[in-house]
Amino acid sequence: MDYVLGIDTRITLLITGFIFLSALLLGVWKYHGIRVDGAAHIYVDIAHRAALMYSFAGILLAVFTELSAWPTIVNLTADLVVLAFFIGAIASYVLHGLRRDTTNQFDGQIPAGLRLSMYGLIAGEIGGFGVLFSGFVAGQF
C-alpha cells in the first residue's frame, strides 16, 4: 500500500532533518570543546541539546500535521511558525557559544527586544502547536 505524505508534512520533515543535522554538527563542536577544555561552553552545550530536542519535537509536529483536519496552508503555517522559533532559539545559543559572552542570557536587566522575542516564542510555539493539535482532535475524534 502506497501512502504519500502531504506537502505540509514533507516540508516539516525536511526542515526537521536539517535541525537534526545541525544537532549532529553541534555535537562535533561540543566534543571539540570537551576535548580541549574539559567542558564545552555552556551555550555550545545548550545549542547541541536544544537542536536534538527540537529535531524530535519536529517529528511530533509532522505527525500532528499529517493527521490534522485543517487545510494544508493552515498546518504548514503553524509548522513554519513553530520551526522558525526552534531555529531562532538554536541560532541564539550558537551565537552566545561563539562569542562566549555569557553563561546566562537572562541574567540581570533583560533588554526589551529579548523580552519581546521571548513572548513571541511562547505565543508562536504554543499557538502553532495548538493549531496542529486542534486539527488532530478535529480530524481523529
Where are these regions (language model features)?
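Alpha-helical membrane-spanning segments of integral membrane proteins, especially the hydrophobic core
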Residues: 114-118
